[in-house]
Regions:
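A short, N-terminal amphipathic alpha-helix
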Residues: 25-44
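Short phosphate-binding loop-to-helix
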Residues: 58-94, 154
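Conserved alpha/beta core of the MobA/IspD/sugar-nucleotide pyrophosphorylase nucleotidyltransferase superfamily
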Residues: 160-220
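Conserved donor-nucleotide/metal-binding helix-loop-beta segment in metal-dependent transferases, i.e.
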Residues: 105-131
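N-terminal nucleotide-binding beta1-loop-alpha1 segment
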Residues: 1-14
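Short beta-strand/loop segment that forms part of the nucleotide-sugar
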Residues: 43-52
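Short, glycine-/small-residue-rich phosphate/pyrophosphate-handling segment
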Residues: 143-164
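Catalytic metal- and UDP-sugar-binding loop of GT-A-like glycosyltransferases, i.e.
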Residues: 98
Length: 220
């Protein structure tokens, strides 16, 4: 799931230290690197759930071959997730939604989550993020109650979702915890990680410039 860079405000919490153009370039790199990673997985159908709908022609030109496009529906994240799973599970036996904000996430974990759902090992798969949310959520059947009255954009998203899932009698499996990039501290962590261990192609190409920008921001 992603906002289309250039059509919606992206990475607003990183402006400053980044300019609007730098934030847009970063979000684009994150998105395309994530799509490349999903396309490389076997046994999955890669789809980009995007907003706003007007971005479809641009995203169709940008997305790797084999990636389908699906415009998000609904108001607010909870309603959008509900609609997304309604759409996907009408045609597929399981679906796993991913963020586009954790570019160095090991894609083997995504494959593990997809396999858990496909093999019937869980009703819900969640990939926790360090900020208290999740980088992934997967389902085998639509479940609107899982996304209703959740305190989105807080550190209680994962906790609330787990409590809700268990109250509904759903079998939950957790994937490893990872970080997403929303704040200046997150961006520094990403740049340090790429400098030490590398990263996906587009994001890694931007990392030296971003690290220099962060260093200038500290000096200034």
């Amino acid at each position: 799931m992603a906002k289309a860079p250039g059509f919606a405000d992206v990475k607003s919490r990183l402006q400053p230290p980044l300019t609007a153009g730098e934030a847009r370039a970063l979000a684009t790199a994150f998105l395309l690197d994530r799509l490349d990673g999903v396309v490389a997985l076997s046994g999955v159908v890669p789809l980009l759930a995007f907003t706003p709908p007007a971005a479809a022609p641009v995203l169709r030109a940008l997305a790797p071959a084999g990636v389908g496009l699906l415009a998000q529906r609904g108001d607010g994240l909870g309603e959008r997730l509900t609609c997304l799973f309604d759409d996907l599970l009408a045609e597929h036996r399981a679906a796993l939604a991913l963020d586009a904000d954790s570019p160095t996430l090991p894609m083997t974990w995504v494959a593990e989550g997809a396999a858990m759902l496909a093999d019937g090992m869980a009703d819900v798969v969640l990939g926790p993020s360090e900020d208290g949310g999740y980088w992934s959520v997967g389902l085998r059947a639509p479940c609107p109650a899982l996304f209703t009255d959740v305190p989105w954009s807080t550190d209680r998203v994962l906790e609330t979702t787990l409590v809700r899932a268990r109250a509904l009698g759903l079998r939950v499996r957790l994937l490893p915890r990872w970080f997403d990039v929303d704040t200046e501290a997150d961006l520094k962590k990403l740049c340090d990680e790429i400098a030490a261990s590398g990263g996906p192609r587009r994001t890694a190409a931007l990392a030296p410039t971003l690290a220099a920008r962060l260093a200038r921001a500290v000096v200034e």
